[in-house]
Amino acid sequence: MQLCIISLWFLAAFIVNADNVQFEDYESNFFFKEHLGTLSPYHEPYFDGLDSAFPETCEIQQVHLLQRHGSRNPTGDVTATDVYSSQYLNNFQEKLLNGSIPVNFSYPENPLCFIKQWTPVIDAENADQLSSRGRLELFDLGRQLYQRYYKLFDSYVYDINTAEQERVVESAKWFTYGLFGDKMYEKTNFILISEGKAAGANSLSMYNACPVFKDNNFHKNATDAAHAVWRNIFIEPIVNRLAKYFDSSYKLTINDVRSLFYICEYEIAIKDHSDFCSIFTPSEFLNFEYDSDLDQAYGGGPVSEWASTLGGAYINNLADSLRNVTNPDFDRKVFLAFTHDSNIIPVEAALGFFPDITPQNPLPTDKNIYTYSQKTSSFVPFAGNLITELFFCSDSKYYVRHLVNQQVYPLIDCGYGPSGTSDGLCELQAYLNSPIRANSTSNGISIFNTECQARPTNVTIYF
């Protein structure tokens, strides 16, 4: 017991700076919260440092938001067999507390000694629900969007397009509270879009609206195969390293280590701190991040042959709205859509954001290559978003620009903005006609309908 108290003191001293874990070979700090894959808290990515201010010679004409829901509790699974589910983690927590998974508290400086005083915050009754942090994330993003684009808010009522899952709808509501305050209900028209096949090409849950993709389990088959290889490679050394912190009679498993890591991630999402995070090294955080990146890349992102099909319908809809800027009968300027992380990555892949990753040049599953474009921590953390801006500039031309979590994405395939420099802007027609995305901007909806054998819909929704 004395050993545990002493080591808790050392652990507390470490936790004071736990957010800034140092790499031994790096001078800069390692911020582990920015490397939790799709479960990372909201943060801005590190691109090329392009200025996100409006260009001096341009006026904003349209803004299009594709927004992920905020930080949440683990998802639900009544069978309690999915390691990342609330029910599984709830059971795992109970085993840690009742000794079914026996921690060796007599081991000198055991980093798990805190468990004796630990109060779990993951509760199966809260499965799928936003955390208070998630609500605040969306409220603040709504406030910031209004401050930035207030000149465009000249209509009385705005369509709020949202996938119908509860946490997405709630996220949209908190966002619009940030936009409009107590006038939210009179200023908004919520359009709840089915997360099943009924939505067709209007879907904000493209996987589920594409019967060929969903019914053939393309997502699950691809990701399961990738994870089976990578997890056996990178988690086994963690099992061996952590085994000494448990009683010798207990055989620590890969799923145990995954559970410890998920508790770290979800406690961050719920209360912004977790002692469990201190048991992992920087390189282990990066390998778990890579595991998340493999999931998105193979499941429907740039490694998948389906990426442009799944993302193309949204891009086609977006492109039609951009083209309509010169239509005097088209007066929409603000376009708001709310969805999940796995539906943003295919859109960004189809836009050409991840040119180094293709079906022919996939992310390897037997090693972490570290330098690659599709970092889910940067592109789709909790509350992550993709913003498309349309400007009219002093040269009498329209220009497009993308922001990822408020940072300018450096478009390089369609020329420059009016400054003549690489500023992230592309002239509208060059953007629409670039070989990288022309098929999606012109034919994305018809391709989705054909390849997916999607359900036809006569409803017009504007993204």
From Swiss-Prot:
One of its GO terms (biological process) is energy reserve metabolic process. GO terms for molecular function: acid phosphatase activity; inositol phosphate phosphatase activity. Induction: Repressed by thiamine. SUPFAM superfamilies: Phosphoglycerate mutase-like. Glycans are attached at N98, N104, N221, N324, N439, N458. Keywords: Cell wall, Glycoprotein, Hydrolase, Secreted, Signal. One of its GO terms (cellular component) is extracellular region. Its EC number is 3.1.3.2. It catalyses: a phosphate monoester + H2O = an alcohol + phosphate. Disulfide bonds: none annotated. Coiled coil: none annotated. It is an enzyme of class 3 (hydrolase). The active site is at H69 (nucleophile), D341 (proton donor). The keyword Membrane does not apply. May dephosphorylate thiamine phosphates. This is Thiamine-repressible acid phosphatase SPBC21H7.03c. It comes from Schizosaccharomyces pombe (strain 972 / ATCC 24843). The lineage of its organism: Eukaryota, Fungi, Dikarya, Ascomycota, Taphrinomycotina.
